[in-house]
Amino acid sequence: MSTSSPPAGTHSAAGATGGAPGDAAAGGAPDLEVAVIGAGPHGLSAATHLRRAGVQAHVFGSPMGFWKTMPEGMKLRSNMSATSMVETVGPLSLTTYAQLSGAQIEHPVELSDFIEYGSWVQRTAVPDLDERMVSGLARTSAGFALELDDGARVSARRVVVACGIAPFERIPAGLGLEGLPAERVSHTAHHRDLGAFAGRRVAVLGGGQSAFESAALMRERGAAHVEVLVRKPSVVWLRGHGVKKRIGRLGPIVYAPTDVGPLWYSRLVEKPGLFRQLPREAQDKIAARSIRPACSHFVRVRLGEIAISTGVGLRGAREQDGQLRLSLTDGSEREVDHLMLGTGYKVDVSRYAFLDDGILAELRRADGYPVLQRGLETSVPGLHMVGAPAAWSFGPINRFVSGSWFAGGAVAREIAGRSSGRPVGGVRS
């Protein structure tokens, strides 16, 4: 996998801070020591660890915003320990939240419970959250200039990007899907209420959790017929906690609480510092094995009324007589009302629309991922990226909530170690 610094794209520059109070470009102190962009699990974790380390961190974004767009009724695949953000044990863990709130939470964790938990973490650890969105980010001589969605401009010495995977939807190319209307083709990420497909015939393309769970939820909410089309010859069915129960006391030894990766690999990917020392070929192999498309047992048992076709892919799709006609790679066709793409996400940080051309030109990348160094810092000094974009440099754990334990701490240690107590001007809401 080659690394590169692609030429600048079509992003608009945020510009300078325009003489705002504390304008670093004008020679004064920046408004903020650290700006965290994003208020999901990774953003909240980074901010919490920074504040615990004595570093001022100002967080922008909608609390748990991406999670609030996910399908109602969804459940998290991760085990209880791995569903904690910030830390697996401590005052902000899922267990502590359940004890303090009285919430009855068990595996698999309901999406609604997880959103409530994340909102509690935000209220507890980042009560001063700034819900304005960052629309532009550019370099200045002393750090960064941020443009907000209300037109305000602020400056920051460092920036942590924790914006998740929303812009990274994977849409298969070469199938003619781009010209079809949204009422015919959509991604699983586009739907909060899958009851909207009641009475309709739907084909789902994909072989992982999102494809199968979306199929189950649609059928349970009244879809007339649902079929899942899986390109690979078989489906990877996860066996739940059966294996851990069978191996007894060995379970905690070979399976890390982060719950990422299969037997033995789990303990390796739990240690990003160790993982990144492996040869690139080994990293890629282990990462692919750890995040391969698979379906949880708790979803599998709900698929009794779902048609599943394996070893078949999509060749093309066209509207005909008010329906959508799918041409499949085995020569057969399907006539449906809607095609849903459960095709996951492909990281490409150039799709973060707020990054300006200057940053993109300087940002070293590998297959769409930023190439990160210690403290999850990019090749742009002072710019850090956490969450899924960190997976190429620090392993697959960063794609998951449990990766926030590592990333938040690593960013905080690096920034706190460089902090000299320099003054900042503050920011007005």
Model-derived features with residue positions:
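Flavin (FAD/FMN) cofactor-binding and adjacent substrate-gating region
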Residues: K68-S101, Y255-R276
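Flavin (primarily FAD) cofactor-binding/catalytic cores of flavoenzymes
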Residues: S2-H11, G15-M64, H107-Q209, E213-R221, ...
